[in-house]
Structures are given as C-alpha cells and as structure tokens.
Swiss-Prot record:
Domain of life: Bacteria
Protein family: Belongs to the TRAFAC class translation factor GTPase superfamily. Classic translation factor GTPase family. EF-G/EF-2 subfamily.
Protein name: Elongation factor G
A Pfam short name: GTP_EFTU
Function: Catalyzes the GTP-dependent ribosomal translocation step during translation elongation. During this step, the ribosome changes from the pre-translocational (PRE) to the post-translocational (POST) state as the newly formed A-site-bound peptidyl-tRNA and P-site-bound deacylated tRNA move to the P and E sites, respectively. Catalyzes the coordinated movement of the two tRNA molecules, the mRNA and conformational changes in the ribosome.
InterPro entries: EFG_II (IPR041095), EFG_III (IPR009022), EFG_III/V (IPR035647), EFG_IV (IPR047872), EFG_V (IPR035649), EFG_V-like (IPR000640), EFTu-like_2 (IPR004161), G_TR_CS (IPR031157)
GO biological process, one term: ribosome disassembly
Sorted UniProt keywords: Cytoplasm, Elongation factor, GTP-binding, Nucleotide-binding, Protein biosynthesis
Chain positions recorded as GTP binding sites: 15-22, 86-90, 140-143
Main location: cytoplasm
Length: 694
C-alpha cells in the first residue's frame, strides 16, 4: 500500500565530524525495526558507513539514502515513511552535504554536548539556510564528561543566529545522565537499559528540576503564541494551551524557519533517539508542506511543479555512485508525477533520452527492487548513461529543467601516476568514474608534462580518492606533492586591438578585433559581451572570438594559472571577404586578450582558508606565533571547555603539513579544522617567487 504524501518525511542527519551522527542514524534504524542488531562505529560495523575506507577511518564519506517507517514512541501516529540521507560531516566532503540538502525537506542537526557548535556545524547551518531547509537539533553525547546542554543552546542563538526552542531538558549529565524531561507533556522519560532503550516509561519530574522546567516551558508557550492571533489572545489572558495547539504552532514556526526545536540525549547510551523521531514527524515538513518546485521550460520561461502524483514526472539526480554489484546507481528525488520501471525519461540538461531499467530503494547497503517511484520519494536507478549530478529527469512531452546545483572549484591539486604501465588505462577509467560521482573532484592531463593532475577540496579528499582507486579499481598510484590552485585576475580596464593576418600565396588568414577588458567583482566569473553593430564582424565569427579569449584565459597571462572574474566586450574590428575564417578570429581574440591583459595590471590570487585551532591555554602563544609565521590573520579568539579557540585566515600554500607541526608544538593536544574561505591577491614577493618557478 503506497504511503500518502503527507506521511512522508525526507530528512538529512547533518553534523560535525565527531558529533555522533552515524551512531544516531544507526539507532534510528534499530528503533524503526530496519536493522536487528545495533552497529557501532567503534567496531567498524555501522550499517550506514558501507565503504571500507569509512569503516577504517570511522567517518562517513558517501551519503547513503535509507528508508524506514515510524509510528511514534507511543504508537500515537499513523505509520510515517522516513527517507534518511546520511551526510558526511568532514569539511572536505562539504559538497556531499550541499547536494543532499538540495533534495531534502528537513534536517536533524546533531551537536556534541561538550564541543558545542563547531566550525563545520556553522558551514552546514549556512548551507541549510541557503536552501531554506527547516531543522530540529539533537544535542547528543549528554553522557560525556563536560556535557553542557544549555551552553550549546546559547551557542545556537549567538553563533548561528537562530531561535532555539528547548523542548526537553536533560535529567543529570555526564555519568549521572538518566533521561530527559518532555516540556510539552511536563513528564520525565526513562528508557529501559535491558532492551537498549526499546521501551520507556513516563515518570514525574524530579522535584529539584520543577522550577527550571516551568521556566523553559514558559519560553515554549511564548514562542507558540506568535503563531496566531487566537493563541496570542489566550496567552495574554493567561489561559493554558493544549498540547495539540503548542505542537501545531511549533510545526508551522519550524517549517517557516522561524524557530529550531531542540532535543537532547545520548545515542550511544540509547537515550533520546525515539523522541527525535517523534520530532521529525511532528515538526519537519512533508513533501506537500514545501513550496512548489521551480524550474524553467525549454524556452527558458519559469514554471512550477506541484508535489502531486497527477503532475508530469520530474526529478533531480543528486548523487551518482558506483556499486560493485549493479554498476552505476543514480540517486534521485522525484518532485512530481510517477515513474515506472521501463519508462523512458528525458534528461533536460543534457538533451538526451534515458530508458529506466531497474529501480531500487536503499537500506544503507542492502537494496530492494521496486516497480515505481512516486512524487516526494527518493530512489536509485540502475545503469543510466548520460546523467550526472544536478541533472533533471522529466517527462519527454512536458520538459522542465529544475535548478542546477553550483559546485565550488577545487583548491588543491596533486599529480598522480600509476605504479606500473599496465595500470595506466585502468587509472584513467577509475578516475573518470570517481569524477562522475563527485563534482568537486576534477581530473585533467597537464599538456606540457603529460602528467595526470587530480584536484579536490582538501588533502583528505584527495587521499580518499587515491585510496578508492586502490580498493575499488585495483590501481596503485604514486602521488606527487600537493600543489595550490592559484588563479590570476586583472585590476585595471584596458582597450586593446588584436590582428591576425597571414598572406602567403593562395587563401590567407584575416581576423581583426577590438576588445575592452575590465575586472569584475570577485566570484562574478567571466562575461563576454558582443557590442558589434552594423556587421563590422559577421555574427558567425563572434563565438570564435569568445572561444579564443576563453582558451587564453585558461592558460593564464603571467604564471599559467586560469584568469578569473573578467568582463570582455567585443566592440569593433574588421573582416576580409575571402581570407576571414573562424580560426583567424579565434587566434585574433586569443592574442588580443593576452596583450591586453598584460597591460591591465594582472595579479596572482591564492586560496585563503578559514582555520580554527582548539588549543590548551599553555600553548596559545606558540600556536599564534606559528599562524603569524604562516602569513595568517587572526580573526578572533574565544574560550571553550577544551581551552582556547583561535580563528584565523591563512593562505593554503602555508598550511601543508600543518597537522604534524601543530601536533609537535602542542604535544598532540591541539586540534584544527580548515575550510576554503576565498581567493585573495598574493603579496608581491610571494607572487614573484611563484611566477619565477613557472
């Protein structure tokens, strides 16, 4: 029997790298009856982490999609179908998080009660804001030394700028953590240890916590009163709200991103996870609660699709994975209509038809074959040929292109070569497949040295790629030293003439252009404007000029790095009836750009990383001194239970080998995280050294 749409929840579980997200997901699968034995990350047996590298490293890399059913702790709901996308918390895999947020309706964000809101949590939060994803928070690890629930709540307010509404308070903390208090029911919940928390009982609130509970319940009532005028009147007249009224109000406020309900517990100790599942059903949206999906039709006009089985089919492919048994799996989210296996769909981004063979639904790494996928659901199709991440699949007669996802450019590159000649071809195939799965990973061949260069979002990202080549494709590779992906840009506007003329018997070559080259704001990218009037250059030659400029931009003008953020206007030129050709105009455009760019104050840009170091106070001086030596700019400092937190912006070029240096400077007691922040102009002495090397 198909589940009605209002009983669906498509959610992600997102968190910082060690907040205990995979353990939380595992418990969800256990309590919803999908897995009969609890898998622990510590034993390398977690169901969701199904790539060998994940089990070894104890972190989650691929986001697996899993389906489970839940009808409430007290069996108080109809059976709801929850699709969970497990997302990695390590910043090198931010792209995976970004992709999954794009197709989710809601998220559970897990925080560690000791570490609180960490830098990656802020990144995930910003990404969720960007896609307008409603969320609830689970403050996990309440049994750890130094657990402090209310500190995390105040960080959500201050660091993330959100409005948390506390729905539960912990009973005790650290070793003494016993259970939680439900502030809406005003009852304490104790989970039974014998059956891993499968059953629980409501008891009265401990006397010493009564006053605190009253105070936090008052905050909930205050928040709920904002929902409607009736509730506001009740509130002002001091009348009690019913449980249903509070929940209805909070649901609306959560879905519209005005508040964030906060739960607490310890997944590892089997306390609190079922209450979070109830929260998913009560406060997170179903596919019918979210706005209609927007897209454009083949003429570029905006169109909407409702989440309904009666609309034409549309879906977004959000992940490609290579499965050892079935080949290429394309994970997609269906937004409208119904897709049956055997149907033909249209990939509107690539303009190609695809026949859908088998359709699968995933439970971590086991799979179930299904006959159809309906609007609002998440599934995987086997063996699609042309689909890459971010493509739209739709009805052939009712074409729609859903919005594209934008992926960041890689910031780090290394050269790889196979250990044996025999592996050369295998390596090419392996890298091709991995690049198809992961849009933030690029592969190209360096034209001068003939080396294969792989680029990604960080050292760990590339290490894992090399590791996967070895594991999944049996290709052993030697890896060069990491190289920074520099860029070039221009600081001044210039006008430049470019002429390419060859006369040597027979047909000649003639191309002549005038370009205005000007800098754009950082991040604006390249823009080409055709301002030719009166046909001084025939329009069939214009694209060739654009192509010539872009090729020259790829090759750089001062140090061979790509030129970015430039606007080029083609405003004049001339042609020859016989000798002009696309080739001649392409060369003219390319040469003209190079000559002009050299006069336009070209500069070198380097990637700057946001670095956050957590260090015991004793080593603070050494850490700061070291960051300054690495050309770092300290942005701020604050206290945390683990010592001091230092935030700085440091050029990537200075950060290689930092983990080893930091370990030795602090006897292994400091930790750091880093993520890409922006490109900035490199100081003259640094730029000169890099240009000389080229």
């Amino acid at each position: 029997m198909a589940t009605p749409l209002k009983l669906y929840r498509n959610i992600g579980i997102a968190a910082h790298v060690d907040a205990g997200k995979t353990t939380t997901t595992e418990r969800v699968l256990y309590y919803t009856g999908m897995s009969h034995k609890i898998g622990e990350v510590h034993d390398g047996a977690a169901t969701m982490d199904w790539m060998v590298q994940e089990q070894e490293r104890g972190i989650t890399i691929t986001s697996a999609a899993t389906t489970c059913y839940w009808s409430g702790m007290d069996k108080q709901f109809e059976s709801h179908r929850i699709n969970i996308i497990d997302t990695p918390g390590h910043v090198d895999f931010m792209i995976e998080v970004e992709r999954s947020l794009r197709v989710l309706d809601g998220a559970v964000v897990v925080f560690d009660s000791v570490a609180g809101v960490e830098p990656q949590s802020e990144t995930v939060w910003r990404q969720a804001n960007k896609y307008g994803v409603p969320r609830i928070v689970f403050v996990n690890k309440m049994d750890r030394m130094g657990a402090n629930f209310l500190r995390v709540v105040s960080q959500i307010k201050q660091r993330l700028g959100s409005t948390p509404v506390v729905l539960q308070l912990p009973i005790g903390a650290e070793e003494e953590f016993k259970g939680v208090i439900d502030l809406i029911k005003m009852k304490a919940i104790h989970w039974d240890e014998e059956n891993k928390g499968m059953t629980f009982k409501y008891v009265d609130i401990p006397a010493d916590l009564k006053a605190t509970c009253e105070e936090y319940r008052a905050h909930i009532i205050e928040a709920a009163a904002e929902y409607s005028e009736e509730l506001m009147e009740k509130y002002l007249e001091g009348e009690e709200f019913t449980e249903a009224e509070i929940k209805k109000a909070l649901r609306h406020l959560t879905i519209t991103n005005k508040v964030v309900p906060v739960f607490c517990g310890s997944a590892f100790k089997n306390k609190g996870v079922q209450a979070v599942l109830d929260g998913v059903i009560e406060y997170l949206p179903s596919p019918t609660d979210i706005p209609d999906i927007q897209g454009v039709d083949e003429h570029g006009d905006e169109i909407h699709r409702k989440t309904s089985y009666d609309e034409p089919f549309s879906a977004l492919a959000f992940k490609i994975a290579t499965d050892p048994f079935v080949g290429t799996l394309t994970y997609f989210r269906a937004y409208s209509g119904i897709l049956k296996s055997g149907d033909t769909v249209y990939n509107s981004v690539k303009g190609k038809k695809e026949r859908i063979g088998r359709l699968l639904q995933m439970h971590a790494n086991s799979r179930e074959e299904i006959k159809e996928v309906r609007a609002g659901d998440i599934a995987a199709a086997v063996g699609l040929k042309t689909v890459t991440t971010g493509d739209t699949l739709c009805d052939q007669d009712k074409v729609v292109i859903l919005e594209r996802m934008d992926f960041p450019d890689p910031v780090i590159a290394v050269a790889v070569e196979p250990k044996t000649k025999a592996d050369q071809e295998k390596m090419g195939i392996a890298l091709g497949k991995l690049a198809q799965e992961d849009p933030s990973f690029r592969v190209h061949t360096d034209e001068e040295s003939g080396q294969t260069i792989i680029q990604g979002m960080g050292e760990l990202h590339l290490e894992i790629i090399v590791d996967r080549m070895k594991r999944e494709f049996n290709v052993e590779a030697n890896v060069g030293k990491p190289q920074v992906a520099y860029r070039e840009t221009l600081k001044q506007a210039v006008e430049q003439e470019g002429k390419f003329v060859r006369q040597s018997g027979g047909r000649g070559q003639y191309g002549h252009v005038w370009l205005k080259i000007e800098p754009q704001e950082p991040g604006k990218g390249y823009e080409f404007i055709n301002a030719i009037v009166g046909g001084v250059i025939p329009k069939e030659y214009i694209p060739a000029v654009d192509k010539g400029i872009q090729e020259q931009m790829q090759n750089g003008v001062i140090a061979g790095y790509p030129v970015v953020d430039v606007k080029v206007t083609l405003f004049d030129g001339s042609f020859h009836e016989v000798d002009s050709s696309e080739m001649a105009f392409k060369i003219a455009g390319s040469q003209c750009f190079k000559q002009g760019a050299l006069k336009a104050k070209p500069v070198l840009l380097e990637p700057i990383m946001s670095v956050e170091v957590v260090t015991p106070e004793d080593y603070m001086g050494d850490v700061m001194g070291d960051l300054n030596r690495r050309r770092g700019l300290v942005q701020g400092m604050e206290d945390s239970p683990a010592g001091k937190i230092v935030r700085a912006e440091v050029p990537l070029a200075e950060m290689f080998g930092y983990s080893t240096d930091l370990r030795s400077a602090t006897q292994g007691r400091a930790t750091y995280t880093m993520e890409f922040c922006k490109y900035a102009e490199a100081p003259t002495n640094i730029a000169e050294a890099i240009i000389k090397k080229q």
